[in-house]
Design a protein with these regions (language model features):
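Domain-level signature for soluble enzymes in the chorismate/prephenate branch of the shikimate pathway
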Residues: 1-180
């Protein structure tokens, strides 16, 4: 992340970049940040009037990734599908806390089709929570799919695929100054 008139580079965890750019902009400091599109979209769902904008999308292409890039996915036991779970009966879903808002939005769409979910926020190891029987399904990022397969899970649905994004405050970067 860059801030101020002098060029300063600050390092934060990817999930903290949107809040950091927002906080700096709120303190009247010009800042940009590089993060995942999924994390940026999740932040915007929490803070709709943040004034943050996408300045540039950098396409993520990796042939080692299961879907070519990180994908937020609905995961469940291998050999089953979401349709195998009865509608109208509560299903426990472990949601990675990094993607809580994107996951809730997705699950709300499924609830409109008759599913009932108890949404449980989990700090990491969502796959293990399914394997241990703590939850029926999980929503987490899949990259290579290795940990998912090792846990005996498979992708039931892709919720969101993610690229890199450069973000900033509309106040500093929107329109008049532009972004190179």
């Amino acid at each position: 992340m860059l801030s101020s008139n002098a060029l300063n580079t600050l390092e934060f965890r990817a999930e903290d970049i949107p809040l950091s750019v927002y906080s700096l902009a709120s303190s009247n400091k010009k800042a940009i940040g590089l993060t995942g599109e999924d994390l940026f979209r999740d932040f915007l769902l929490k803070k709709r009037n943040s004034g943050l904008i996408l300045l540039k999308k950098v396409i993520w292409e990796d042939r080692n990734a299961l879907f070519g890039k990180p994908a937020l996915c609905l995961l469940g036991p291998k050999g089953k599908a979401l349709n195998d779970f009865p509608k109208g009966q509560e299903l426990r879903v472990g949601i990675s806390t990094k993607y809580k808002e994107l996951a809730k939005k997705y699950l709300n769409q499924l609830e409109s089709k008759g599913y009932i979910f108890r949404k449980l926020a989990i700090n990491g190891c969502c796959e293990t929570a399914v394997t241990a029987g703590l939850v029926d399904l999980a929503i987490d990022i899949v990259y290579t799919g290795k940990s998912m397969q090792e846990a005996g899970l498979e992708v039931y649905d892709r919720v969101f695929t993610s690229d890199f994004v450069i973000i900033g405050s509309k106040r500093f970067w929107g329109g008049k100054n532009g972004f190179p």
